[in-house]
C-alpha cells in the first residue's frame, strides 16, 4: 500500500501526471496539478480540448471525495467551456463541491495554464457512491 492520497492512485490520475496540491475544508475546494503527456497534444502542439475534461473531472472527483469524507463520484454530466488554448506543460485545476446532497453533488472547476491564465471552466453533476464492494446501507 502507498501513502499517496487515494485519488492519486487511480490509473486515470497517473496517466495525466496528477499531483494533489491542497484542499480547503471551508470552501470544499480541491487543487490539483497535472502534467499532460505529449500524446495529449493536438496538431497545433496544444493540449487537445476534449482531453482537458479529464483533469477537470479528476479534480472535481477529488473535491467530492474530500468534501464527502471518502465517497466516490460518478459524473452524470459535465459542461466544459474552453476559453483559451492550453500549452503542453503543468496545468492547475481548482475544483469546488458547490452543493453536496445525500446522492447528488454539484461541482465547478477552473483550469489554469503554467502562467496562471484561466483557460477553461467546467460544471458537473455527480452521483456519490460508496467504494466498490462496500456493504449497502439501510436505505440502499
Where is each model-derived feature located?
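Terminal targeting signals and extreme-terminal segments of soluble enzymes
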Residues: 1-140
Amino acid at each position: 500500500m502507498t501513502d499517496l492520497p487515494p485519488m492519486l492512485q487511480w490509473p486515470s490520475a497517473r496517466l495525466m501526471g496528477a499531483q494533489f496540491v491542497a484542499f480547503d475544508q471551508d470552501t470544499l475546494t480541491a487543487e490539483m496539478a497535472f502534467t499532460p503527456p505529449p500524446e495529449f497534444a493536438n496538431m497545433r502542439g496544444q493540449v487537445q480540448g476534449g482531453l482537458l475534461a479529464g483533469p477537470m473531472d479528476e479534480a472535481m472527483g477529488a473535491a467530492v471525495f474530500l468534501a464527502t469524507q471518502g465517497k466516490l463520484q460518478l459524473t452524470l454530466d459535465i459542461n466544459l467551456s474552453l476559453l483559451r488554448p492550453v500549452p503542453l506543460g503543468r496545468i492547475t485545476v481548482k475544483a469546488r463541491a458547490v452543493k453536496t446532497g445525500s446522492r447528488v453533488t454539484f461541482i465547478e472547476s477552473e483550469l489554469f495554464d503554467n502562467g496562471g491564465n484561466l483557460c477553461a471552466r467546467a460544471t458537473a453533476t455527480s452521483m456519490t457512491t460508496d467504494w466498490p464492494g462496500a456493504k449497502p446501507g439501510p436505505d440502499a
